[in-house]
A protein has these predicted regions:
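N-terminal "arm"/small-domain region of PLP-dependent enzymes with the aminotransferase-like
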Residues: 1-58
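Short acidic capping loops at alpha-helix termini that bridge into adjacent secondary structure
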Residues: 27-28, 78-82, 103, 190, ...
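Short hydrophobic alpha-helical segments of the AMP-binding
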Residues: 71, 118, 179
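PLP-dependent aminotransferase-like
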Residues: 97-156
């Protein structure tokens, strides 16, 4: 039997790379890797965005104030608690650069980019593994035991990719209290929250004002079916930390059309 040769690491939605490596025509691939809403972009966006093509002849507002205010209205928080980025991936990277975690605990199986970005700043990632026998539901008592003082960052995807398991807000409070006691920062990725039957019951955004060890990430790639626009945002009540992250960020990482797409008033 021939030994299987390992393939290079690449994102599962990179159909051109799959075609190149495996020889499968990209037209014959049905991709389940990116979890983008199959209904596609909204009718309003399809109709309105072409009207704003001239916007690419101008630099966008460096502070993205109108966009942040619109997002703030959408998620019911002060726009000063919001930082926008070039997709949630840029924000994951920025959080890692600022926090410089040495020992991160990631609830998995989950998105591989968390571990990748943590490794780039010299940190190590350990996994708290959800069990298929428990339908991938979080065992809060077991997680609490794993949150020891040598852990400095906890990463949660809620709802989780790929298991779809959810953590309700009351459970999240228990986790955050435990982490605060041990000096652990918590990054919650809510990229898939709009797919949940009741997003308002699981989002951690209402907790941002009460926990300075919490940051929540979201974006428009999945539910709003616009990964090519690259628009993500972070919500954090710790404004000192948010300003630190912003200071590390390059200017104008959100292009003009993405900013318009995210701003319902445009």
């Amino acid at each position: 039997m021939n030994k299987l040769e390992p393939k290079e690491h690449f994102h599962g939605s990179d159909l051109e790379k799959i075609e190149e490596i495996y020889g499968i025509p990209k037209e014959n691939i049905i991709s389940f890797s990116a979890n983008v809403n199959p209904l596609g972009i909204s009718y309003d966006l399809r109709k309105e965005l072409p009207k704003h093509l001239d916007a690419i002849t101008r630099y966008p507002d460096r502070e993205y104030t109108s966009l942040r205010k619109c997002i703030g209205e959408y998620v019911h928080t002060d726009y000063e608690n919001i930082l926008v980025g070039n997709g949630s991936t840029e924000l994951i990277s920025l959080v890692a650069q600022i926090m410089q975690p040495k020992n991160a605990l990631i609830v998995g199986p989950t998105y591989s980019e968390y571990e990748h970005e943590i490794s780039l700043v010299g940190g190590r990632s350990h996994y708290f593994r959800l069990q298929e026998s428990d339908r991938f539901l979080l065992d809060i008592k077991a997680l609490s035991k794993a949150l020891t003082k040598d852990v400095d960052l906890l990463v949660l995807c809620n709802p989780n990719n790929p298991t779809s398991s959810q953590i309700d807000r009351q459970t999240m409070r228990i986790i955050l209290d435990n982490c605060k006691e041990h000096g652990i920062f918590v990054m919650v990725d809510e990229t898939y929250v709009e797919f949940a039957p009741h997003p308002e019951e699981i989002t951690s955004i209402p907790l941002a004002e009460y926990y300075n060890n919490l940051i929540i990430l979201r974006g428009i790639s999945k539910f709003f079916a616009a990964p090519g626009l690259r628009l993500g945002y972070a919500v954090c009540g710790n404004r000192k930390l948010l300003h630190e992250i912003d200071s590390k960020k390059n200017p104008w990482t959100i292009n003009s059309l993405a900013a318009i797409a995210g701003d319902r008033k445009s």
